[in-house]
Each structure stands twice: as structure tokens, then as C-alpha cells.
Amino acid sequence: MNLIDAAQHTATAGLPDLVRAAQGGDSMAMAELLDALAPYVARLCGPIALDDGADAAQEALITIFTSIGQLREPAALFGWVRVIAIREAVRVAKKAHRAATTELQDVPARGDPQLASDVRDVLRRLAPDHRAILVLRDLEGLDEQTVSDMLAVSAGTAKSRLHRARRRFRQEWDR
């Protein structure tokens, strides 16, 4: 079970009920739902949108707020939220059109703080599309088809983009 799965597992108790209440117009339930989702959305948006991660997370939460009625199955909440967050993060990162110069915040450190810092430095130098695919495949652990669906690209495009992103990451790592 990866870090995200563990966080989802501990945070999901009662969320389907909150979703249904929010869909029914309960503003308190909506506020509680958005509060529960905010850290997850921020973890997804940060590594992709970098210094604009907070803006991307806010835009994603707004989309969740305005579109909650479109979620057909409350049990699919995290998958639905993940799609929204990733798309917003990529959109915001592309819109920025500038090199990221601030620290990447939400890459989990596994043991060695220097290694985590080095990984953040390399990710900072990658294009938003490359960061997105690396986060989804290598941090989130999603399969190629799910990633291609989330990024609205063909499976072949996702596979080649992942290959290029990993190659670019290795090149930057070796610098």
C-alpha cells in the first residue's frame, strides 16, 4: 500500500455519506468534504504545478465544488478527484510558461533527506507534462491506461511521454 492509498484508507470513513449530502445541497457537508479532500488535492497538484501548486489545488477544489453533482458513484470519489486535480495542475503549469524556481514541496521523503532534495531539484527542471506522468505512474503507481485516461491522451502517447520523461529525468539526474 503506497502513501496515498494509506491516507485515502484512513480518511474515507464517512465520505460517501458526505458526498451524498453535498450533492443534496448540504453546505456544511460540502465544506467538510472539501476540507477532507484539500490535503490530497494539494499532494497531487504540488509536484506538477510546482510554485503554482496552491493555485492549481484551489482551482481543482472549485471544480469539485461546482461539479459534485456529476459524480455518479460516491465510492469513486478519489478517482474522480484525482482526474480533476491532475488536469488542473497540468493546465496551471502550462499556463505559467516559466521555469519553476521554488522548491517542490510534496514529494514524499523516504529516508534520506538529501535524496528527496535531489529528486525535487530534478523534477523542477522537467516540463509539466513530464512531471505529471512521472507523478501518476511512479508516485501514484497508476497503470498506463488509467494515466492516459486522466491526461486525456492515447495510451501510446502516455507510454512514449513516460519514456521521454524518465529519460529526461535520468539525464538531469546525471548532471
Feature-to-residue mapping (PLM):
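Extreme N-terminal regulatory/targeting segments of RNA polymerase sigma factors
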Residues: M1-R20
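Short, charged helix-capping/linker segments at alpha-helix termini
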Residues: L3-A6, Q23-A31, A42-E59, A155
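Acidic, proline/glycine-rich intrinsically disordered inter-domain spacer in sigma factors
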Residues: A6-A7, A96-R124
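Residue-level preference for hydrophobic side chains embedded in well-ordered alpha helices
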Residues: L33, L37, V41, C45, ...
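Amphipathic, Lys/Arg- and hydrophobic-enriched alpha-helical face
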Residues: L34-D51, S67, L123, D174
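Arg/Lys-rich amphipathic alpha helix in sigma70-family domain 2
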Residues: T66-E73, V83-E103, D112
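Short, Lys/Arg-enriched C-terminal cap helix and immediately downstream tail that follows
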Residues: K94, R166-R175
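Helix-turn-helix DNA-binding module
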Residues: R124, P128, A132, E140-T157, ...
